[in-house]
Amino acid sequence: MTIAIGREQERGWFDLMDDWLKRDRFVFIGWSGLLLFPCSYLALGAWFTGTTFVTSWYTHGLASSYLEGCNFLTAAVSSPANSMGHSLLFLWGPEAQGDFTRWCQIGGLWTFTALHGAFGLIGFCLRQFEIARLVGLRPYNAIAFSGPIAVFVSVFLLYPLGQASWFFAPSFGVAGIFRFILFLQGFHNWTLNPFHMMGVAGILGGALLCAIHGATVQNTLFEDGEASDTFRAFTPTQSEETYSMVTANRFWSQIFGVAFSNKRWLHFFLLFVPVAGLWASSIGIVGLALNLRAYDFVSQELRAAEDPEFETFYTKNILLNEGIRAWMAAQDQPHENFVFPEEVLPRGNAL
């Protein structure tokens, strides 16, 4: 009789690494964690460092750190100087030449934060894909998170790439983002852009749907215990439904005349509306990067120029945009030394 003894198959370094990364632990790491955790740590660290210590005097002529007297709303990691163009501003590159102080002064922390932040967001999206695959879920969480990634990449990376330099990207700070929004309105008439309109409809529509859905579920909870309220009389492992879809359907059928009768379609709609809005606004920002125009109602502008008694909300907004451009350009781009004579500043009923 012959006895065959099988040899255990040798496992390579990849298999050992795979086992270690996917081990069940309090904070899952996974392959996506190799991208997520270092990039997120470095992006947040750079942002906290910049807002605490680094000035924007050499890039924007501004104070932007806690050290200079700013608060949480006015501190920022500001975009690099216009003269830097689209350089990645490596610490060891020709601009900084290994000098950390000079690197901070010319805006190196901004490119560092933007690029590591983008890869951190992508790593978080891949993390959702990876965990969903391991536990047998569909990947719709990761698909939904593509919306915020698209917005971040289009606003912070693609828009300035279409313009003259990183200088025209938003700074990483609350007031800095507000300044960027005013810039988009004045120089691109962003609020009249159809992609902006779709983005607003998606985000506000998603908030409305979320509120309606949550309220409807709360309204139709089953009285399934002695204390049947929102926080009691429910166990996470129970097999029974905790609210009545039938009652909810009857309620909204009476309110609107139509209602969702399929939970899967209902929740897909809740997913689709805000994500579609985020993607639409991202596409619009890419259009702005290429300096594509929004709606132009030239006939109204011509008539308003000829007839002082004719004015529309559109012509008022056009005048306001001219004002933003004229008064903002000199403040926003001090390195250009803009000087506007009074006769070129906008005048009209809107101002």
From Swiss-Prot:
The keyword 4Fe-4S does not apply. SUPFAM superfamilies: Bacterial photosystem II reaction centre, L and M subunits (SSF81483). This is Photosystem II D2 protein. The lineage of its organism: Eukaryota, Rhodophyta, Bangiophyceae, Cyanidiales, Cyanidiaceae. CDD domains: Photosystem-II_D2 (cd09288). Chlorophyll a PD2 binds at residue 196. The chain crosses the membrane at residues 39-59, 123-139, 151-164, 206-226, 277-293. It is an enzyme of class 1 (oxidoreductase). Chlorophyll a ChlzD2 binds at residue 116. Its EC number is 1.10.3.9. The D1/D2 heterodimer binds P680, chlorophylls that are the primary electron donor of PSII, and subsequent electron acceptors. It shares a non-heme iron and each subunit binds pheophytin, quinone, additional chlorophylls, carotenoids and lipids. There is also a Cl(-1) ion associated with D1 and D2, which is required for oxygen evolution. The PSII complex binds additional chlorophylls, carotenoids and specific lipids. It holds the Pfam family Photo_RC. PROSITE patterns: REACTION_CENTER. 2 of the reaction center chlorophylls (ChlD1 and ChlD2) are entirely coordinated by water. A plastoquinone binds at residues 213, 260. Keywords: Chlorophyll, Chloroplast, Chromophore, Electron transport, Iron, Magnesium, Membrane, Metal-binding, Oxidoreductase, Photosynthesis, Photosystem II, Plastid, Thylakoid, Transmembrane, Transmembrane helix, Transport. One of its GO terms (molecular function) is mRNA binding. It is found in: Plastid, Chloroplast thylakoid membrane. It is a multi-pass membrane protein. Gene3D superfamilies: Photosystem II protein D1-like. Belongs to the reaction center PufL/M/PsbA/D family. It catalyses: 2 a plastoquinone + 4 hnu + 2 H2O = 2 a plastoquinol + O2. Disulfide bonds: none annotated. Pheophytin a binds at residues 128, 141. One of its GO terms (biological process) is photosynthetic electron transport in photosystem II. InterPro entries: D1/D2, Photo_II_D1/D2_sf, Photo_RC_L/M, Photo_RC_L/M_CS, PSII_PsbD/D2. It comes from Cyanidioschyzon merolae (strain NIES-3377 / 10D).
